Amino acid sequence: MNKTFSILTGLVMTLAASLCAAQAEDAPKVTVTPIKGPLYMLDGSGGNLVASIGDDGVLLIDADYAPWVEAHAAAIAGIDPDAASPRFLLNTHWHGDHVGGNEHWGTQGTVIMAHENIYQRMSTRQEMKALGRAVEPSPAAALPVVTYEDSIAVRFNGDVIQVQHFPTGHTDGDSVVFFTEQNVVHIGDHVFENAFPFVDIGSGGNVLGYLSNLEKVLAMIDDQTIIVPGHGTSLLSKQDLQEWVTMLKSSVSRVAALLQSGRTVDEIAENGLGVEYDSFGQGFIKEPMWIGFIAASL
């Protein structure tokens, strides 16, 4: 009897340990990439975060999806075990993969900052027709409490963080964040590394505005600037950004020329833009959708 009980107990303990190990493997894991000084890129499931961690505390750029909040908190604790909840959180735009964690941090007392258009979109029901979904208003704790129309400056952890609104690009509320002392830029969803970008036409985005914004950013940075993309695993250089912009501009020119020749959007999508663009359509936005964004923006 005792021997049987011991065997059963051992089996139960082994099964429990296996389940715990499986759960640990399935738990969200954030990849931490040191950038420079107090700055770190946190790569989870949605848009990339930048964390400034230092004597003034923690400041976050973007918040990923809600289920990833604890993973990001653990990543921050791994960098600095004494770090408290972020003092500030700044959203680059309103999409859920960038603001999903807002509610959690808002209830912890984090001051959330964003462009006024982000507040307006988060506080009202939004239709994302390109993706076939509706987004309900966010809870009060998730909403920005500090908003701006053009720009805002934050002095934190020895840096002057310049936040500049770039309208009519990815959406109508996007900001690019310049860490001026470190020469680091979080460019938000104005960059999808090695992929066609999502341009949210229904939220005031426009492909031509997107390209115009990127040209402006290129004029504001130098060859030593480190760029954090909204999506992607790599830190980028000015040259990387220039090459990506060149690809996007050439695809826009090709679609415009085909439309001018009498081709329909469906015909262009069916025939494709050419093998040189194939690799860029392997991400979230496939080539036919990118062609549609271009046509809707011309």
Locations of regions flagged by a protein language model:
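Metallo-beta-lactamase
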Residues: G57-V58, Y65-P67, A153, V160-S250
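Active-site neighborhood of phospho(di)ester-bond hydrolases with catalytic His/Asp-centered motifs
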Residues: I61-A63, S85-H95, M113-E116, H186-G188, ...
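Accessory terminal helices/loops
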Residues: L15, L19-Q23, A219-I226, T233-L298
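Divalent metal-coordination and catalytic microenvironments
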Residues: P38, S52, D62, H93, ...
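Conserved beta-strand hairpin/beta-sheet module of binuclear metal-dependent hydrolase folds
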Residues: V30-I76, V177-F179, N183-D189
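Active-site HxH/HxHxD metal-binding segment of metal-dependent hydrolases
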Residues: A77-A153, D172
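Bacterial N-terminal signal peptides that target proteins for export
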Residues: M1-V12
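Cleaved targeting-peptide boundary
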Residues: A22-V30
